[in-house]
């Protein structure tokens, strides 16, 4: 017999699959079933995914075994047809997968009732997919009585039922792959977009630290690129830096003094008490005076300070009109006598004027109206030695005239009481002469306080030593004196001990720790400057030199 050539594979769009046609011809008539036609129009065949490759293999092999029979020629032909059909089904599956990915859903409708049934069931599955994926196929719609059921549709119905699960699984796999695969842009696989985390705002302290670190890094980078300086350039740079620092300090000091004293409101109101030492009060007074001085008057026409013109003679010429507001009393409008300063507001008056003002039930400052104390205002005032010495230096012979006036007043008072003042004067002169000859230094209880040599003050021990070899060591180098003793007094004592002439005291200079002491420096001031915090039982060493000419 001549071998028949197998038929070619039908295209995907045919109304019946090859499996269906082969099953209808080979299957017995008892197993054939009618397949009802769908009532509603179905979608195109492209929405339907055929059964998987493994299922089609098993199905086709089973069908081919029934059709083959026992003949050898039929076996060879069936195996070739199975291979051809498997290849066709693989191509169909690839096409269907591509159509599912690209979202192709609309094509021409096919009149095949089996495809109608498949597409209708897929529509119901798509609607119920969010709720629960169906494991079993839904019930088919009722058949229409107008059409006759062909026996070929029964086997296709069975094959469609077997491949329905595979269709659902393939569709779900495609969608899962779509969700899992990264987004494709310009042929590149990009990772999924991440949600932007909220940026935390920096606090003020963090911004400050970051800016400081940036400035430091910038300075380090600039220092690396900067050329190395020579020694002269470094010294000049340090000198300029020091001048800028001093200039800045002076400006800050002037500004603080101007704000403190230049804008004071005259009101009678209580303020904070300031019980500082006398030295701090004097420093504040000096700062206040320097802040109020018009600095333009210190310069001459050539730009050189007037002080430098008279520096060799150690004198300074200045108009008294500028200094008068600082050395006159605000109560009597005269020069201050026995300067007394209010601690809180730093205004100075005469002692007698201020006490008289307090006796008339006044407890505020006469100048600014600052409240001092309700019941004891005299406890919050102090003797201002610095202002008193300034007044005596600016107004010469004023102190001597004041002493003469006091002597005359006391003599008149004693004469009014019937006391012989002439005999007392003769007796006092004789006593002073005897003390000068014998060298005694006793104080009498009936003497006035200013003749008691400040024995009631705090006492300090001073050790006087020669600073050069041409000066001798005095016989009594240890001196116990008041802390208010000045350097001029010590120089007079040394001139009497060395040359027996008090007028030569200007030939000596006093040094402490290698530093020249001013003639008006008190022992207390030198102690606070050089020996602050040390016990006063230890002597203060002061060396005397000849004046350099």
UniProtKB/Swiss-Prot annotation:
Biased composition range(s): Low complexity: 12-29, 145-156
Region span, Disordered: 1-263
Record-linked Gene3D superfamilies: Phosphatidylinositol 3-kinase Catalytic Subunit, Chain A, domain 1, Zinc/RING finger domain, C3HC4 (zinc finger)
Gene Ontology terms: cellular component: nucleolus; nucleus; PRC1 complex
Zinc finger (RING-type): 329-368
Coiled-coil portions: 206-260
Superkingdom: Eukaryota
GO molecular function: histone ubiquitin ligase activity; zinc ion binding
Record-linked SMART domains: RING
Compartments where located: Nucleus; Nucleus, Nucleolus
UniProt keywords, alphabetically: Coiled coil, Metal-binding, Nucleus, Zinc, Zinc-finger
Biased composition (Acidic residues): 38-49, 87-100
Chain intervals with Basic and acidic residues compositional bias: 205-235, 248-258
Amino acid composition bias (Basic residues), ranges on this chain: 118-130, 236-247
Pro residues bias spans: 134-144
Record InterPro entries: PcG_RING_finger, Znf_C3HC4_RING-type, Znf_RING, Znf_RING/FYVE/PHD, Znf_RING_CS
GO biological process: negative regulation of vulval development; nematode male tail tip morphogenesis; regulation of axon extension involved in axon guidance; regulation of cell migration; regulation of egg-laying behavior; regulation of transcription by RNA polymerase II; reproductive process
Keyword Coiled coil: yes
SUPFAM superfamilies documented for this protein: RING/U-box
Keyword Disulfide bond set for record: no
Subunit (UniProt): Component of a PRC1-like complex.
PANTHER family with a match to the protein in the record: POLYCOMB GROUP RING FINGER PROTEIN
Record's function text: Component of a Polycomb group (PcG) multiprotein PRC1-like complex, a complex class required to maintain the transcriptionally repressive state of many genes, throughout development. Required for ubiquitination of histone H2A. Plays a role in the formation of the male-specific genital sensilla (simple sense organs) known as rays. Required for normal migration of the hermaphrodite specific neurons (HSN) and for extension of some neuronal processes. Represses vulval fates in hypodermal cells that do not normally contribute to vulval development.
Protein name: Polycomb group RING finger protein 3 homolog mig-32
Organism field: Caenorhabditis elegans
Gene (UniProt): mig-32
């Amino acid at each position: 017999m001549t071998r028949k050539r197998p038929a070619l594979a039908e295209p995907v769009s045919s109304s019946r699959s090859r499996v269906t046609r082969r099953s209808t011809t080979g299957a017995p008539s008892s197993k054939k079933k009618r397949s009802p036609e769908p009532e509603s129009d179905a979608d195109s065949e492209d929405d339907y995914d055929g059964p998987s490759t493994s299922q089609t293999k098993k199905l086709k092999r089973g069908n081919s075994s029934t059709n083959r029979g026992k003949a050898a020629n039929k076996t060879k032909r069936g195996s070739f047809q199975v291979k051809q059909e498997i290849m066709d089904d693989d191509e169909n599956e690839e096409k269907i997968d591509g159509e599912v990915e690209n979202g192709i859903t609309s094509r021409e409708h096919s009149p095949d009732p089996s495809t109608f049934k498949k597409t209708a069931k897929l529509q119901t599955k798509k609607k119920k997919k969010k709720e629960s994926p169906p494991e079993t196929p839904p019930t088919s719609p009722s058949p229409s009585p107008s059409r006759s059921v062909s026996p070929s549709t029964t086997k296709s119905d069975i094959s469609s039922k077997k491949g329905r699960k595979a269709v659902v699984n393939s569709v779900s796999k495609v969608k899962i792959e779509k969700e899992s695969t990264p987004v494709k842009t310009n042929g590149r696989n990009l990772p999924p977009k991440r949600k932007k985390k909220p940026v935390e705002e920096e606090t003020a302290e963090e911004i400050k630290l970051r800016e400081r670190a940036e400035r430091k890094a910038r300075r380090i980078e600039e220092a690396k690129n900067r050329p190395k300086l020579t020694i002269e350039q470094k010294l000049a740079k340090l000198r300029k830096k020091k001048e800028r620092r001093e200039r800045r300090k002076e400006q800050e000091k002037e500004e603080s003094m101007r704000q403190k004293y230049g804008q004071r409101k005259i009101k009678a109101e209580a303020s904070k008490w300031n019980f500082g030492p006398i030295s701090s009060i004097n420093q504040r007074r000096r700062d206040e005076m320097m802040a109020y001085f018009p600095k333009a008057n210190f310069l001459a026409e050539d730009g050189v300070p007037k002080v430098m013109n008279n520096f060799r003679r150690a004198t300074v010429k200045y108009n008294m009109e500028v200094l008068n507001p600082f050395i006159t009393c605000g109560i009597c409008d005269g020069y201050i006598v026995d300067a007394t300063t209010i601690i809180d507001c730093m205004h100075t008056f005469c002692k007698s004027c201020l006490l008289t003002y307090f006796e008339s039930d006044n407890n505020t400052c006469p100048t600014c109206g600052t409240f001092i104390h309700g019941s004891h205002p005299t406890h919050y005032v102090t003797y201002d030695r610095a202002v008193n010495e300034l007044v005596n230096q600016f107004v010469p012979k004023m102190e001597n005239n004041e002493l003469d006036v006091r002597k005359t007043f006391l003599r008149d008072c004693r004469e009014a009481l019937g006391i012989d003042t002439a005999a007392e004067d003769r007796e006092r002169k004789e006593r002073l002469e005897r003390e000068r000859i014998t060298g005694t230094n006793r104080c009498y209880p009936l003497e006035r306080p200013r003749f008691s040599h400040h024995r009631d003050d705090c006492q300090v021990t001073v050790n006087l030593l020669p600073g050069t070899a041409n000066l001798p060591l005095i016989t009594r180098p240890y001196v116990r004196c008041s802390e208010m003793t000045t350097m001029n007094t010590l120089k007079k004592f040394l001139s009497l001990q060395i040359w027996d002439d008090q007028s030569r005291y200007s030939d000596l200079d006093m040094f402490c720790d290698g530093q020249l002491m001013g003639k008006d420096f008190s022992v207390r001031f030198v102690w606070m400057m050089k020996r602050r915090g040390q016990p006063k039982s230890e002597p203060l060493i002061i060396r005397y030199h000849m004046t350099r000419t």
